Amino acid sequence: MSISKAIAADLLEIKAVSLSPSQPFTWASGIKSPIYTDNRVTLAYPEVRSQIEGAFAELIKAEFPEVEVIAGTATAGIPHGAIIADYLKLPFAYIRSKPKDHGAGNQVEGRVTKGQKMVVVEDLISTGGSVLEAVAAAEREGADVLGVVAIFTYELEKANRKFADAGVKLATLTTYSELIEIAKETGYVTKEELELLKKFKENQETWQN
């Protein structure tokens, strides 16, 4: 089994990702979704956590070999980013969702020098909006952002467009497509549920019709 499929299987096993096509979850945006993800759960499982951080380190070395600093997004990207930075023996910073309203008013915490080559760590890519805002904040501070890495992506077309429009490279450990196939192979979902999950990826508004 490939590392991406192994991680997808782990996410299902520890219930970091839950699938429920027949009783959908409601996202904050109001969208009815057959999937819910809380990758913070991975931190509670040392073996899973170690595999994820090791895979992140290898992914970054392969995709972004010039990296000089790792930055985590607040809050979910911070623990993963800090562990990855330790693996790679690199400096670590983190990026707030908005600047502090006191003190120095920093949005990027840590020491980032102008032109320093950065990789931003996120746990999940949904629409991509929040992590791309973090990238923009880091660039305003002078960082040269090489790209974004994440544990998992829903592979939504709107996110793909946003990354393409921003000119930001995205690399993930595993994907929605891989995860739902693993879910079918392991009996987590039925063939009929798999078809609903595929429809959700194609169109988040009409998948239930």
UniProtKB/Swiss-Prot annotation:
One of its GO terms (molecular function) is magnesium ion binding. It catalyses: orotidine 5'-phosphate + diphosphate = orotate + 5-phospho-alpha-D-ribose 1-diphosphate. Its cofactor is Mg(2+). Its EC number is 2.4.2.10. GO terms for biological process: 'de novo' UMP biosynthetic process; pyrimidine nucleobase biosynthetic process. It comes from the Bacteria. Pathway: Pyrimidine metabolism; UMP biosynthesis via de novo pathway; UMP from orotate: step 1/2. Pfam families: Pribosyltran (PF00156). Transmembrane segments: none annotated. It is an enzyme of class 2 (transferase). Orotate binds at S126. InterPro entries: OPRT, Or_phspho_trans_dom, PRibTrfase_dom, PRTase-like. The keyword Cell inner membrane does not apply. 5-phospho-alpha-D-ribose 1-diphosphate binds at R96, K100, H102, E122, D123, L124, I125, S126, T127, G128, G129, S130. Keywords: Glycosyltransferase, Magnesium, Pyrimidine biosynthesis, Transferase. NCBIfam families: pyrE. Homodimer. Catalyzes the transfer of a ribosyl phosphate group from 5-phosphoribose 1-diphosphate to orotate, leading to the formation of orotidine monophosphate (OMP). Belongs to the purine/pyrimidine phosphoribosyltransferase family. PyrE subfamily. This is Orotate phosphoribosyltransferase. It comes from Lactococcus lactis subsp. lactis (strain IL1403) (Streptococcus lactis). The lineage of its organism: Bacteria, Bacillati, Bacillota, Bacilli, Lactobacillales.
